Structures are given as structure tokens and as C-alpha cells.
């Protein structure tokens, strides 16, 4: 059985990043998250320390690092490097190292720098470790989430106000999407996992835990809020009906359940920015991934950490890939804040309306507040990929780049 205190703690620690003024009524969270004994044994077998996992991967797959790095094509590389404008002797933080594409481009522009390479994914951390061997004076690899970055930096001796530039390349990497065992893609069958760092936290709920345990109203709220899915109720109903017959454990199984809620003609009617057909379950997968990995709250915490550790005049560059991320970045840079007293994210609202919520949780309504301006925008308008970039890397078609200088 899933260790319940972890689930409580994960949601109680969330900072609000859902910056809309309206908060949906989410219904009641189930009394506990159910997992089978088999799932528990699987979790127990996978328990390892963070560093050991990364080191073993490094030793066993050294010759495959170049191949892994090529799986992920960095987005808007020229724009990122231009906005960061690296100069000799400067110090940078890449908060989303991934396969290192942006970091390598920064080093090509100016090699006499120090760059801290952070990622929550042990696979990406192993790549950063490998790159640090090639650039021992420049690269400092770090493993952790945005919410852990401040502690990691302080432990490494980095003080607030140190960095000349910080990069955040948000969302899911191609390495994650293209590995069926990670459970991110609906096009490749695999276990319904979606955790970016599940090996580090065996008790962390998977996407399968979410779809098999939450009630219909909570599922619909997750799909509506994090996937901006207008058919959230219909999809949630289909999920609940399907799981009453058999557990939902595979990615393509979930994709088929979502598709089954619509007529065949509607499955590929949605179009992406390139006018290509997309599966009707795409937004469902996005919503579950964001929810499982706590991405929006992590983003908000990461932005605050970036601001704290940038020096005055330091540059922040953020690449987002859907409107939820971009909205948070935009409002943060514009100084539109919501004090913790008034913050109620979807997760916090779930806690408040369920038996998991504590008696002292704040129930006041959300109130938008504008904080003192802390940033000067480098570009007044958001930047998007050039046509050639989209042709070379269609996955980056929805990228939006915002950059600002700390005042």
C-alpha cells in the first residue's frame, strides 16, 4: 500500500501556481490511495539511493551517452544563448539540464564560465555528470527538483545573488517521451507511470495510482485544470467505468479508454500548431503528468529560487510549452503575485475539501496582488520558434521564450 503520509506531505507543501481568480469545487478526495501488493513489491524492489542509481547508469552506459543526448533536440538554442549573453568568468545555472543541449551551446559561446547543471531526472543527472568529466572546470552536476535547488546550492557553497544567468527549459524531455518504460507517451505502450524521478521516491504516486484511486469529480478537475480539457467530465466518467472492470495500468490502455468516450471520427480531429492531427487523449496525458510531478508548483518555487540566486543585472530565461506554464512565468516577471495567505492551488483546494485537510488551513478567497517590480523584460513580447526550428524539431512548435533582467 502506498505510504499515505507522503501523499499528504506532498500536497501540504505545495505553493500555489494556479493563478486564476476562479477556483473550481473539486469534491472529496478519497480517504486513501490504493495500490496492489504487487505494485508495492515493485516499489520495494526499486528502492535505491539517488547517487547509486545515477552512478550505476554512468558506469554501465558510458558509451551510450552520446546516443542518449541526441534523443532530445534543444529548442530555440540561438535565442537562449543570445538572451543569456554569457561572458568570460560568469556563473550560470541550468535548472533543467536534460541532455545538455543548451548547456553545450552556452559553453560553445563562452567556455570560460562555471555552470551548475540541475535536473530531477537521474538519467539527465548522469548525462550532466558525464559532461562534467569533459569540462571539469566548468560543469557542476546536481540532482534534484526545483524545490530542492536552494538547499543543493547552499550545500555546494553557492550564495544568493551569485548567478549571472539562469535557464529553465520546462516540461517533458524527448528522452522521457521516447522511453516507453517511463510511461509518458500515449503512442508507445508502457506502464502508466509518468514520474520524472520515481526511482528516487518509490512511494510517489504514479499516473496509474491517480486514475485508479481518485473519484470522478477529482479526476475531472485535474483534467480540466492541468490539461485544459473541455471534455473533462466525459473522460473522467469513462475512466471510472473502465477501472470498475479492470485496473488501468498501461499507457495505451488509458489512451484507448479516453478514445472510447468519443465517436471514432473525433479521435484525431484536434490539430496542433502545425495543423497535424493529435490524439484525443493528449491533454489527458498532459494533465496527469503535470499533476503527478507537481510541475506548476515546482515551477513557481523554481522561479523564486532563480530570483533569489541571481545577482542584480542577472538574466532569467524561461522556455515554456503550454499556456499554464507560460501564464505563471509571465505573471511572475510582471510582479503579479499571490501571497501564501491567499493561495489555493487545485491541490490545496483538494486538501481543504477532503478529510486530509488540516483544521488550520486557510480558507480565505484568492486575492491577486501586484508585488514591487523586480524584473526588466528583455523582449516586450514572448518569443516563438522560427519556422526552420519547427521543421527541424516539431516537438518544439509550442515553445514560448520569456527573458528578463533582475533589477
Swiss-Prot record:
<feature type="binding site">
    <location>
        <position position="119"/>
    </location>
    <ligand>
        <name>S-adenosyl-L-methionine</name>
    </ligand>
</feature>
<dbReference type="GO" id="GO:0071424">
    <property type="term" value="F:rRNA (cytosine-N4-)-methyltransferase activity"/>
</dbReference>
<dbReference type="InterPro" id="IPR023397">
    <property type="entry name" value="SAM-dep_MeTrfase_MraW_recog"/>
</dbReference>
<feature type="binding site">
    <location>
        <position position="169"/>
    </location>
    <ligand>
        <name>S-adenosyl-L-methionine</name>
    </ligand>
</feature>
<keyword id="KW-0597">Phosphoprotein</keyword>
<keyword id="KW-0496">Mitochondrion</keyword>
<keyword id="KW-0808">Transferase</keyword>
<comment type="function">
    <text>N4-methylcytidine (m4C) methyltransferase responsible for the methylation of position C839 in mitochondrial 12S rRNA. Involved in the stabilization of 12S rRNA folding, therefore facilitating the assembly of the mitochondrial small ribosomal subunits.</text>
</comment>
<comment type="similarity">
    <text>Belongs to the methyltransferase superfamily. RsmH family.</text>
</comment>
<dbReference type="InterPro" id="IPR002903">
    <property type="entry name" value="RsmH"/>
</dbReference>
<dbReference type="GO" id="GO:0005759">
    <property type="term" value="C:mitochondrial matrix"/>
</dbReference>
<dbReference type="InterPro" id="IPR029063">
    <property type="entry name" value="SAM-dependent_MTases_sf"/>
</dbReference>
<feature type="binding site">
    <location>
        <position position="176"/>
    </location>
    <ligand>
        <name>S-adenosyl-L-methionine</name>
    </ligand>
</feature>
<feature type="modified residue" description="Phosphoserine">
    <location>
        <position position="358"/>
    </location>
</feature>
<keyword id="KW-0949">S-adenosyl-L-methionine</keyword>
<feature type="binding site">
    <location>
        <begin position="100"/>
        <end position="102"/>
    </location>
    <ligand>
        <name>S-adenosyl-L-methionine</name>
    </ligand>
</feature>
<dbReference type="GO" id="GO:0070475">
    <property type="term" value="P:rRNA base methylation"/>
</dbReference>
<keyword id="KW-0809">Transit peptide</keyword>
<dbReference type="Pfam" id="PF01795">
    <property type="entry name" value="Methyltransf_5"/>
</dbReference>
<protein>
    <recommendedName>
        <fullName>12S rRNA N(4)-cytidine methyltransferase METTL15</fullName>
        <ecNumber>2.1.1.-</ecNumber>
    </recommendedName>
</protein>
<dbReference type="GO" id="GO:0005739">
    <property type="term" value="C:mitochondrion"/>
</dbReference>
<keyword id="KW-0489">Methyltransferase</keyword>
<feature type="binding site">
    <location>
        <position position="146"/>
    </location>
    <ligand>
        <name>S-adenosyl-L-methionine</name>
    </ligand>
</feature>
Amino acid at each position: 500500500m502506498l505510504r499515505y503520509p507522503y501523499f499528504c506531505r506532498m500536497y501540504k507543501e505545495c505553493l500555489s501556481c494556479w493563478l486564476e481568480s476562479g477556483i473550481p469545487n473539486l469534491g472529496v478526495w478519497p480517504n486513501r490511495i490504493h495500490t496492489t501488493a504487487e505494485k508495492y513489491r515493485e516499489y520495494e524492489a526499486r528502492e535505491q539511493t539517488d547517487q547509486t542509481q545515477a552512478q550505476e547508469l554512468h558506469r554501465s552506459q558510458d558509451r551510450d551517452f552520446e546516443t542518449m543526448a541526441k534523443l532530445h533536440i534543444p529548442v530555440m538554442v540561438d535565442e537562449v544563448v543570445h538572451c543569456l549573453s554569457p561572458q568570460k568568468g560568469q556563473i550560470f545555472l541550468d535548472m533543467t539540464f536534460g541532455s545538455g543541449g543548451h548547456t553545450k551551446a552556452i559553453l560553445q559561446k563562452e567556455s570560460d564560465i562555471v555552470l551548475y547543471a540541475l535536473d530531477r531526472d537521474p538519467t539527465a543527472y548522469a548525462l550532466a555528470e558525464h559532461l562534467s568529466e569533459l569540462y571539469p572546470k566548468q560543469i557542476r552536476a546536481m540532482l534534484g527538483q526545483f524545490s530542492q535547488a536552494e538547499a543543493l546550492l547552499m550545500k555546494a557553497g553557492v550564495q544568493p545573488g551569485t548567478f549571472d544567468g539562469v535557464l529553465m527549459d520546462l516540461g517533458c524531455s524527448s528522452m522521457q517521451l521516447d522511453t516507453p518504460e517511463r510511461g509518458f507517451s500515449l503512442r508507445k505502450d508502457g506502464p502508466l507511470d509518468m514520474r520524472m524521478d520515481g526511482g528516487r521516491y518509490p512511494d510517489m504516486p504514479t499516473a496509474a495510482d491517480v486514475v485508479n484511486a481518485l473519484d470522478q469529480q477529482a479526476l475531472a478537475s485535474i483534467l480540466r485544470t492541468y490539461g485544459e480539457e473541455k471534455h473533462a467530465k466525459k473522460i473522467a466518467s469513462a475512466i471510472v467505468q473502465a477501472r470498475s472492470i479492470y485496473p488501468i495500468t498501461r499507457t495505451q490502455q488509458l489512451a484507448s479508454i479516453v478514445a472510447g468516450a468519443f465517436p471514432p471520427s473525433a479521435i484525431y480531429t484536434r490539430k496542433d500548431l502545425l495543423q497535424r492531427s493529435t490524439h484525443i487523449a493528449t491533454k489527458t496525458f498532459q494533465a496527469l503528468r503535470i499533476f503527478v510531478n507537481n510541475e506548476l508548483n515546482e515551477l513557481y518555487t523554481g522561479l523564486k529560487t532563480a530570483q533569489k540566486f541571481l545577482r542584480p543585472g542577472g538574466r532569467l530565461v524561461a522556455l515554456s510549452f503550454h499556456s499554464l506554464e507560460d501564464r505563471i512565468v509571465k505573471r511572475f516577471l510582471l510582479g503579479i503575485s499571490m501571497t501564501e495567505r491567499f493561495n489555493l492551488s487545485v491541490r490545496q483546494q483538494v486538501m481543504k475539501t477532503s478529510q486530509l485537510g488540516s483544521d488550520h488551513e486557510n480558507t480565505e478567497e484568492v486575492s491577486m496582488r501586484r508585488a514591487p517590480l523586480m524584473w526588466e523584460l528583455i523582449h516586450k513580447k514572448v518569443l516563438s520558434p522560427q519556422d526552420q526550428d519547427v521543421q527541424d524539431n516539431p516537438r518544439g512548435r509550442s515553445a514560448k521564450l520569456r527573458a528578463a533582467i533582475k533589477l
